[in-house]
Amino acid sequence: MSSYLFTSESVSEGHPDKIADQISDAVLDAILAQDKRARVACETMVKTGVAIVAGEVTTSAWIDLEALTRKVILDIGYNSSDVGFDGETCGVLNLIGKQSPDINQGVDRKNPEQQGAGDQGLMFGYATNETDSFMPAAIHLSHRLVEQQAKIRKKKNSALSWLRPDAKSQVTLRYEDGVATAIDAVVLSTQHDPGVKQKDLIEAVREEILKPVLPAKWLHKGTKFHINPTGKFVIGGPVGDCGLTGRKIIVDTYGGWARHGGGAFSGKDPSKVDRSAAYAARYVAKNVVAAGLADRCEVQVSYAIGVAEPTSISVTTFGTGKIADEQIEKLIRKHFDLRPFGIIQMLDLIHPMYQQTASYGHFGRKPKDFTYTDGTGAQHSATSFSWEKTDRADALRAAAKLK
C-alpha cells in the first residue's frame, strides 16, 4: 500500500497579492459593463499607502479608476491606518496606456469565429471526483478556511471582531493508495488587532474557522494544528508585503496538484487565452469526470498568437479512464469548440463577473446567476463561474456508450 502526504495553500481576500488581483478584475468588470469589445490587460501593485494600476487597454468606456480602486480596498476591510492600509487616504497612481496595434491585428477578424488567440501559450484544466466540487481536497479545504475567516470577520456583531483582513491557510492530507484518508496538518495564520491573547486567538480560530470547515472524518488525534505559529500577526496587508497581480497562480488553480501553464488570470479580458482557455480546460475536464469517463482528468490546450485553432489538445486520466485517453480526446474535439471565440460563446465570458473570481479560487465554485447594469443604465442577466457547469456530461457519456 502506498502512502504519501500532499499540501496546498490559500490566501484571503486581504492578502496583498489578492488585493491587487481584485483591483485588476474590478477594472476589467467596470470596462466590460460599458464596452464588450474592450481589450484589457490590467496589472496592480499595492504597498504602504499606495496602489499603482498599470497596463494596456483599448476601449470606448470611461471609468473612475481612483474611486473604483478605493472601493475595492475599503470593501475588503482596509479602512484605517490602524489596520495598516486605508482606502480613503492611500494614493492611487494610474499608469494605464493603449494596447499595441500589433496585437490587435492578430486577434481581431471580420469573421469573429476566426478570432486569433491573443498570445501563444499552454493552459491546463483539471478535475477529480474526490470532492463534490470536483477539486483536489487540499486546495478545496484551504480555500474554505480563509473564506470562513472573512465571513466571520465581516459578520455583524462578530465575536471575533479583532480579526483583520490578511490571512493564509494550508492543509496537508494523507493519501493511501491514491485516496485521501486523513488530515495530517493544518496551518491558519490570521492578522489580528494588537492585545489579543494567543490562547484566546487559538481557541476562537479552532471553534469558529476550523471546525465548521474541516471534515470530522479526516481529523484524528495526530492531526497537527498550527494557528498563528509565530505568535503575533498584527502587521499585515500591503504594509507587511508588497502585493502584485498574478502572483498567486497556484492558489488560483489546483493548489499544485495539477500542472500549470504559467499564465495568470486577473486583469485579463477573455480574448487572452491565458484566462479563457484555462477556464475552458477546466470545463472540459470537469464534464469528463462528471460523465464518469474518468476519476481524474487533466486537459492541456495550446495556442499560437493570431491563430484560432489550438495547436494541441491533450488528455491525461492517470490510469483512471473508463475508456482510452485517445477516445476521450476525440470526444472533446467533437463536443467542445476550443477556438478563442468558441470558448467565449460557449462559456458566455464577456460580461462583468471577474472580481468574484479573484479570491478563494477560480475553480470549484458554484455558478451564480446575477444582474448587472451597463453603461446606458440597462439591466442584464448573466452567470458567473459558467465553466463549473456539468451540462455536457450526459452527452459525453452517451457518446462514449458507457452504461
UniProtKB/Swiss-Prot annotation:
InterPro entries: ADOMET_SYNTHASE_CS, S-AdoMet_synt_C, S-AdoMet_synt_central, S-AdoMet_synt_N, S-AdoMet_synthetase, S-AdoMet_synthetase_sfam. It is found in: Cytoplasm. Pfam families: S-AdoMet_synt_C (PF02773), S-AdoMet_synt_M (PF02772), S-AdoMet_synt_N (PF00438). Residues 99-109 are annotated as: Flexible loop. One of its GO terms (cellular component) is cytoplasm. Its EC number is 2.5.1.6. K(+) binds at residue 43. Keywords: ATP-binding, Cytoplasm, Magnesium, Metal-binding, Nucleotide-binding, One-carbon metabolism, Potassium, Transferase. One of its GO terms (biological process) is one-carbon metabolic process. Mg(2+) binds at residue 17. Belongs to the AdoMet synthase family. Catalyzes the formation of S-adenosylmethionine (AdoMet) from methionine and ATP. The overall synthetic reaction is composed of two sequential steps, AdoMet formation and the subsequent tripolyphosphate hydrolysis which occurs prior to release of AdoMet from the enzyme. This is S-adenosylmethionine synthase. It comes from Xanthomonas oryzae pv. oryzae (strain KACC10331 / KXO85).
